[in-house]
């Protein structure tokens, strides 16, 4: 049985989680922005993350984003930077997870607030411009 959940409001998603084994450690993924996944439904990205997490033999994951605005087509000029509420949620998720994997592609930069709040991140690859692959 998979435990699914999310913390969101009308326009933003702050946390999403999928946990299938509470005895194993969890991963925190930090990507660019949320898409359609919610407390019940998985989108393409969440399905990929489930596969990665199972492959790494973790018991589940939390998903946070650089920007909390839900958008199926990322447009960084619409994102609010340094959102206090989003940062607080990332800090909460960080405490629950053993590993942190970042990945936001060419559209995002490593924001100072993330550098100030999280150390020892991993990624699944590096783009030519130095950003972590999505």
Where are these regions (language model features)?
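Active-site and ligand/interface coordination hotspots across diverse enzymes
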Residues: 1-43
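Short, glycine/serine-rich, charged loops/turns that create anion-binding
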Residues: 34-36, 68, 107
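A short mixed-secondary-structure module that forms the rim of ligand-binding clefts
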Residues: 35-57
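Active-site-adjacent loop/helix micro-motif of nuclease/hydrolase catalytic cores
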Residues: 38-41, 73, 78
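Amphipathic alpha-helical interface surfaces
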Residues: 41, 45-49, 62, 86-93
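Short connector loops at secondary-structure junctions
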Residues: 58-75
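Glycine/proline-rich loop-helix segments at beta-alpha junctions forming the active-site rim
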Residues: 76-134
């Amino acid at each position: 049985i998979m435990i699914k959940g999310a913390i969101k409001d009308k326009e933003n998603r702050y946390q999403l989680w999928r946990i299938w084994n509470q005895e194993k450690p969890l991963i925190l993924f930090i990507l660019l922005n949320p898409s359609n996944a919610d407390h019940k439904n998985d989108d393409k990205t969440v399905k990929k993350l489930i596969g990665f997490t199972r492959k790494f033999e973790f018991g589940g994951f939390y998903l946070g984003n650089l920007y909390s605005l839900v958008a199926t087509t990322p447009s960084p000029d619409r994102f609010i930077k340094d959102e206090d509420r989003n940062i607080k949620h990332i800090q909460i998720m960080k405490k629950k997870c053993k590993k942190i994997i970042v990945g936001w592609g060419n559209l995002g930069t490593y924001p100072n607030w993330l550098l100030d709040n999280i150390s020892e991140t991993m990624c699944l690859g590096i783009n030519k411009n130095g950003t972590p692959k999505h």
